Amino acid sequence: MIYESTRDINRKINPSEAILQGLSEEGGLFVLRDLGKNKLDLKNLVGKNYYEVAEEVLKLFVDFSEQEIKACVENAYKGKFSNEKITPLVELNDSYVLELFYGPTSAFKDVGLSLLPQLTKTALTKVNDKNDILILTATSGDTGKAALEGFKDVERTKIMVFYPNDGVSTVQKTQMQTQEGKNTKVCAIHGNFDDAQSGIKELFVDEEFKKELLTKNIKLSSANSINIGRLIPQVVYYIVSYLELVTTDKIKLGDKVNFVVPTGNFGNILAGYYAEQIGLPVNKLICASNNNNVLYDFLKTGVYDKNRDFLKTVSPSMDILISSNLERLLYYVSGCDNVYVASLMKDLKETGRFEVTKEILNRIQEKFQTGFADDLDTKQTIKKIYEKDSYLLDTHTAVAYKVLLDKLDKEHVNVILSTASPYKFTESVYTSLNEATNEDEFTLMNKLHEQTKVAIPENLKDLDKKEIRHKDVINKNEMKKYILEKLGDL
């Protein structure tokens, strides 16, 4: 089992090395050329629990023993999710909501970032690497806290998270600023998520920087979904949701299903593509964007153009103009053409845009549909669904629900991926149901609970009473200097 870079066929490594390295030296992402060669036996998975399905999925992607895989899965999830199903499926009208927010930080990122530290520890042992790992992560809100919580006090790892100072919700910011753990560091930047992500990607290809870290016996890795070890765990919940539909007689084994996915960095929806490649019967993957609809335009026209205003929306985790995981899809739909992908990424870096061939666009459109919702659509959808069904959507799931309503396919079962608790975006959710207010987000959290009776996740209760531990704010071009200065604190 060999991974290679999306941009260079000659850069090949084993799965453990891919997990530890995160990003290829020249900036490419690691992929399996023969993805889909081995399929899941879905029939034998019917009736299995989350842990058992996860073990079968991981076998197709990592070079660990069965015992190692089992230990990784159990250590990741046992006792850490407040719902025993991990990712339960809830019926809503004629569709289904896959609730992905029962982890330690109330966002879907917990699924991948609870397992990634276990994969990282196991990979370090397998490759007999004596260096420690420095996890560098950019976040638009949810990844940061989930990564910090996942890697907190994990032996031989250090983690630094960078987030846009004015680009996350108050709850998300407070979650990160109050993070505990002797190996954690959090810093805001003046800029947006794309600035943070681009800054980190540049450090991964900065040989001088990496050599300096090696003198301290430290190697770089990432907890963003550019790391294949973050992406693979997300494949599992697509399979699990499908199997639940089968066991509850909502569909027959083999029936195709639509998945509607609120999308920013393209990792969550790409996990659905991976699931389909290993045997899941998927009709369409529906990419739901907010007003930063660069993916919507690309999936319609084949032109990816980030030369546009970056908009702050009520769904901040999707406020992204450079969707990193799209590169992996381009690799597969181009017939694993590393040279072609490298040329597209070069165009994107130099001009801010690229255009795929008509043939490749057609291949993408065979599996992907798209839609977008603006802030007004989003807030109206939250209000409409709550008043009609007493179900409270967060602002990202509401984008997906609005897109589903616009494109409703009654021939197939539709599953909406619900990516976060509504309490992570309290102000926007509260003001969707009520008049605008100047009250702080934590006051509104309690008022929203009183109004809706939806339980506040334990990790968010009393968050405002915790000690603020991380207050640093830097310019976007100061990340390298900051990391080298602060490493000694970890």
Where does each model-flagged region fall?
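PLP-dependent amino-acid enzyme catalytic core
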Residues: 1-490
